[in-house]
Design a protein with these regions (language model features):
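S-adenosylmethionine/decaboxylated-SAM
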Residues: 66-71, 77-251
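Class I SAM-dependent transferase core
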Residues: 37-74, 85-86
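Short charge-dense sequence patches
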Residues: 22-35, 49-61, 133-140, 159-166
Length: 251
């Protein structure tokens, strides 16, 4: 109990937490709010650091390694944010949202660009995510004007989404990491990707779909990047996740 209320000392100025205390007196709701606020504050700090490093003309690789170590922060949201800010990407499609770490960072980048839209597709969330607030619960209301979230299977929803958009600047795969789904999403999104745009994927070492895609489209790719993720508690120590992103040739 002491730990909970010592944490409250840092947020009692926040009208939202005061409202929760008055209305519910629910310790779990208070702890959840504090946890979400802490995560959001960290992501804003990370975003600010990335912007500073971009202003110093640091490369994406330098930014990712420095920021992930400094803040003990997962790399893939750093990459997505950095690409959007560096290349001023506008139309983004992602498959897989979960809590919303990537979505928060992407939407913050679009807000700072003062334009653009994120189209996210995710199937029904896990029980843990549901308990915390549902798919994308880390995304605050003020960022949602840049966001179109659809709940469902990417195998059914990705094609109509892309057909409606007609083109995009960035595609991010982080849904089902089976060979079939990864290969399907990569090949479909590539058809709609603008020249100089990016095809990105988390967990590329779950199958050979990413390597196969590169082999099939190497004449259309200008840059290939592979980055090893930081070690996370849920990871197999012998199979650390790998992140990949490709830049399409400028036509």
């Amino acid at each position: 109990m002491y730990l909970l209320f010592s944490k409250l000392n840092t947020v009692l100025h926040d009208p939202n937490i005061i409202s929760i205390i008055i209305k519910t007196r629910n310790k779990q709701a208070i702890k959840q709010y504090i946890s979400i606020k802490k995560s959001r504050d960290l992501m804003i700090t990370v975003s600010n650091e990335i912007d500073f490093l971009l202003s110093k003309n640091k490369t994406i690789g330098e930014i990712v390694e420095y920021v992930s170590k400094k803040f003990d922060f997962i790399k893939y949201p750093i990459i997505w944010y950095s690409l959007i800010r560096k290349y001023h990407l506008k139309i983004i499609v992602e498959t897989g949202v979960s809590m919303g770490w990537s979505s928060f960072m992407i939407l913050t980048a679009l807000q700072r660009e003062n334009s653009g839209k994120l189209f996210s597709i995710d199937i029904d969330s896990s029980e843990t995510v549901k308990r915390e607030g549902g798919i994308g619960y880390l995304v605050p209301n003020h960022l949602k004007k840049y966001w179109n979230l659809v709940i469902g299977d990417t195998n059914k929803l990705l094609k109509p989404t892309l057909d409606e958009l007609k083109q995009l600047d960035m595609f991010i795969h982080d849904s089902d990491h089976s060979y079939q789904t990864m290969s399907y999403e990569y090949n479909l999104a590539w058809k709609f990707l603008n020249s100089n745009g990016f095809l990105c994927s988390d967990d590329i070492n779950h199958s050979n779909a990413f390597d196969e895609f590169i082999s099939q489209h190497k004449h259309e790719i200008i840059n290939i990047y592979i980055i090893e993720e930081i070690q996370r508690s849920s990871d197999d120590v012998n199979k650390r996740p790998m992140i990949g992103f490709l830049q399409k040739i400028i036509s």
